[in-house]
Structures are given as structure tokens and as C-alpha cells.
Amino acid sequence: MRIDLNSNTSGGIHDVQNRQTGALRQTLGPAFGFRRMRKAELATACVLAASLASGEALAQASNTPTQKSGAASEITKRKAKRTKTQSDREINQDRAMRVGARPAPVAPQIDQFAKLDTLRIKGLEVNLPGPADTLIQDKGGIRSALAEIGIGFIAWTQNTYVNNLLPNAAKSTIANQQYSGQNPTFYTLNYMMVTYDLSRYGIPDGQIIVGAEQQSWTWQPGGPDRLGIDTIAYYQTFLDRRLELKVGYLMNSYELAGTVVGGNPGANVFGPSSNVLYQGGMNFAPAPTPTLNVTYHFDDRLYNKLSVQRSTSPDGVFAHISANPTGLDWSTANAGLLLLDESGYRNSAAPGLLDTWLRAGVGFNNSHYVRLANPTQPRTGDNSLYYVAADRQFWQSNVHDAASRGIYGGFSVMGAPPDLNKVSQYYEVRLYAKGLFDSRPSDQISLVATDTVWSDLAVDAAAAKGNLVHRDAKAISGTYTAHLGPGIYASLGLTYIDHPTSITYTPQIGHALNFSASTSIFF
């Protein structure tokens, strides 16, 4: 509320006070004359002393009209001084603006989500949205109340529809469907993850993570349906955060390789993922396994990450989930250990510093795999894999306010022995943009081209049986992901696939143009 000392109301109050004072003076008259004189003399002395102490005050006093009382004179001088100070400040600001100087910095406000951000899941290579970018944020104070006792959480649901738009596409019964989109395909993936802060007990960055995942598919080979855990983990750091340790039931697809385009799972439900990593035994959300991950940071950018995990089933993802839908079993049939090692260089975008992530990894698996050239012979346990990937920001569209916005490019190369793996090579080139338009600063656009190369041994074996075969499957996809509001993403994608089936095909299913629509909502 602003109070105007020169308002009519204030003037009325002073009039009443003056009338009351005048009546009192008429009654008491000369009795108080001596006091009035002494009071006026005292006020005059104060004014002279102040004038001598300050040349500026003297000049101001010399320009101020004489008042009837000492108190009124002091009030007038204070108001005049404030007015001059304010005028000087405005003049200085105006001069600064004319020469292009920036205004004085404003003290930053306390971010209400800063404390909540400390409870986000640690040790991941992908960027799950923070509490501020969720649908419920901190409504009702529920997140803040849980944070007081060290608990954080995130939940999300991804719902996707895929359908081949080509007019001559060969449809089939659901039971005989051979690829996602051959018939209209729908699937839903739902997650709930809770963290507990152990740093309150003196454990550096200590955290316990517990998560569950539920999925349903109209095309079961894409899944299958399941309800179970996706994470039960313990995390902490050592040596002033130079060393990270994470152990438990993990999903390494979020911790190694960086297969999600742009690093945001909410924006990448269509991003092509190679089977090389999964057929090599890497665990992921629907198929977590016991894992120990140790990361050493040589400096702020260079790192090495070592992972020892129980391999998923060597017979494939479908076989693993069918045998262990809850994810709690220690192992599945014929599964052994998978050793992964990744070295990388990574720096995040900053004003004038472009985002860069280079990584390369190798894996060795002693699970018992079927020999593709001789399936009837005893299984062997000498499988391996490798990958090399890079992502680089080419241009920053908003350097100072949001350095991560701009245009990016990247590539991935992966491989595995053709005698034990149906996919022996995988190549990917990607171009994507974050916040390309000022009116849509959180949207993402991606264009991705891939080539999946099948094992020569597997292709030759299928051709020997009289099947039509293809030695690779090429695809190109474009996706636009709109950030519609806190925690709400919607994606539209179009993917052309040359030979969408695995190795064998018929002339009617040699090509596909899959339309995809998806929503991702984070809570």
C-alpha cells in the first residue's frame, strides 16, 4: 500500500491538529511564549550545525522555504533529501541505459524446487525431468513434505500407437504379426520410482532407489506384458565425487551407451535402438538384473565406467521377460555374467561452450549362446560386443539464457560376432534440434537414419531353406516432440523401413511406412 503524505485526507488531519493547537495557544497564551522562543532557537541551531557538516545539506537548506515550526522544517528537509536522492538515482540509471550498461543485478529468488532436485535419481546418463517439469509439481506440498523426511519420487506413463500407412501393406492376424505396425499396434509403459536420501546420515551423495515398471502390448513379441521391478539400488560417491558406486538391480540402458536420442526419454519413444546391446545381455527397464557399476572421473569431463552384471537371457528379451517377469530372479537359464567397460568425454552446454559427448565401450559375456551356423551343437560362452558413439552441439540458439538449445548431430556404430548374434552390425546417423523456435523453447525435432545388418550365417541358413531373405534393414525416421506443459510431452513420428521384418520376408511385407503417435506424462 502506498501512502501519499500530500493527500486530502492528510491535509484534513493537519487542519484539525492546527485548529486544536491554535485554541490551546489562545488559552495558555504568554505562559508558553518563552518555551516557543527557546524551541525555535534550538531548531535554528540544529539546522546551522547540519549545514556546516554538509555542503550539500547547506545548499538544500538554503533553497528550502522557512517553516513555522522546527518539526515541520525537519520533515520538509527529509522529504527534499529523499526526492533529490531518488532523482539522482534516476539520472544515473538513465545515463547507464544510454551508454548500454546493464542494470544492477537483482538478488536471485530462492528456487522452491532446488531442494527437491537433490532427491532426483542419481547415476543415470539420461535426463529424467525434474520436479518442476512434472504434472503435479509440488501441489498440496506433498513433495516438500516427503522431502523433509528424505523421500523423492517420479512416475511417468508412455502410451504409443504405431500403424503402417502403406496402402498395399499386408495385414495379418495379431497372432501372426511380424513387426510393430503391421497391424495397428498399441503399447503402454508405466513407471514409478522412489528415492531415499542417505546423505543426511553422512553418506556422501548416498541414495536408495526403488522402482517398478508395468507394460502392456497388443503385439506380444514387442514386450511381452509384465509387472515387476525395474530398479532396487544403492548409490554413493567417494573421493570428493571422483568415484561413483551403484549396486543392485539396475537398468544399464539408462546408465551406459546413451542410446536415447537427445538424452530425454520423454522425447524419444520412437528413437531407434539397436538390438546389439540387448542381444549381448545388457539389462534394461523390463529386464533388470543384479549389477555393480563403478565410475571414475579423471576430471570434470573424462571418465571410465565399469559394469559387472548378470546377463539377460542369451535367447533374447522375450525369453528373458517370460521366464522372469518380476525381475527378482537372480538368473535365467543359460545366462552368465556380462562385463562392460565404457570410456568417455562429456561436457554439458554452457554459454559459449558446445555440448559434447564421446563414448566407446566393449562387452564380454560368458553366457551360453546358440551357434547360428550349427544350432544342434553345444552352446558356447564367448560372446562380445562393442560400440562407439558421439553427439555434438553445432550451434546454440540462445547462448546466455538456455545454452542447451540449438542444433545437434551424432552417430553410433555397434557390432557383435556374426556366429552368435543375429544382428552383427548397426549404424546410426542423427540430426536433432532442441528448442529451435523461441515460441517453443522445450520442443525437440529429430531426424534419424539407421542400418541394421544381419548375420551372414543366419541369412545363409534361412536362404538355404528356400526363404526370401534380406541382409539388412534400412530406416529413416522424423519425429517432432512438443512439450505441452509441465510434465506433458506429445510426439508425432513417421518412419520408412525397408524390410521391417527379421531376415525373412514376403513381397507384401518388404516395406513399411509407420505413423507413430505418443504421449509421455511425468508426475
Describe the residue ranges of each PLM region:
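Outer membrane beta-barrel
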Residues: N183-P314, N421-A461
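Transmembrane beta-strands of outer-membrane beta-barrel pores
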Residues: N159-N163, A212-S216, Y249-S253, V308-T312, ...
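N-terminal periplasmic/intermembrane-space "pro-region" immediately following the signal or transit peptide
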Residues: R2-L5, D15-V16, F34, C46, ...
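Long, well-ordered mid-to-C-terminal structural blocks that present hydrophobic/aromatic surfaces
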Residues: S348-S439
